[in-house]
Amino acid sequence: MTIFHFGAMSVRLDIPLTGVTTALPQLARTLVGQADLLHAARTVATEVIQLLGPAIVRPALSARCEDYLVFALLPEGNDLRAGLPDELIARILRAEEGALAPEQVRDAVSACTSYGNDDFTVIDWNGAIVVDRTPEDALSVLEFANVELIEMRWLDDRLEDALEEAFRAAAQSMRGARILSVQTGRHTRRIAELQIDAAALYESVNNALKLFGDQWLARLHQSATQRLHIDDYERSVLRKLEALDSIYGKLRDRQVQIRSELLEVVVIVLIALEMLVLVRG
């Protein structure tokens, strides 16, 4: 169990392996998306949230989750790949019992990283294989990459909802003096709060990357980022943050413009009244 300061939680379920490597594709197919495992993880997460209580700001367990299967294997002999040919690795990572096309095999094993002669890690979007006598560092990097992925996906969904709310607020409020109403003020503050919360979460997740000072761990994380398409979600989040900023800016500018126009009208009316008083006097 790992708890991250930016509001994420990772539950790790360890299952001892026995048997031959050729049986791993069938095992992978059984484990991927397994409802009982997901339920067990959510139960643990719920208990931890209840245990921490007031230490959590706005406690809630999101319906969104991300499961990721990692096979941590011990190296055997001098040839680490002797019992793990590319075709078998690909079937394990893709949880496929049958044969895969050559291009699928190449794609599945394309993200392979090694630190020494006695280890290697193959990362795919659905799972990974770590062959190492001390796999904890690699497992920690993979864990964080998946936390990063689900945070970006959650943030992307939240920003999508925020944009829809902002578009509705802008459409309702950009009609004349209505933009100065109390409701528009609430909408504007809400947009600003969403923008600040999203930007703070984005920075918190990315600042955590600074923990990977080791060059190999940084390279492993980069490989995981590419395979999990985290960069795509980050770009989407940044675009939506910019869109929110644009909407918020336009609402504020329009409010300033309307206030200036109303002030001009008030000044003109006051001058007219003053002149009227002088003429009648």
Language-model segments: which ranges?
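N-terminal juxtamembrane/topogenic regions of multi-pass membrane proteins
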Residues: 1-7
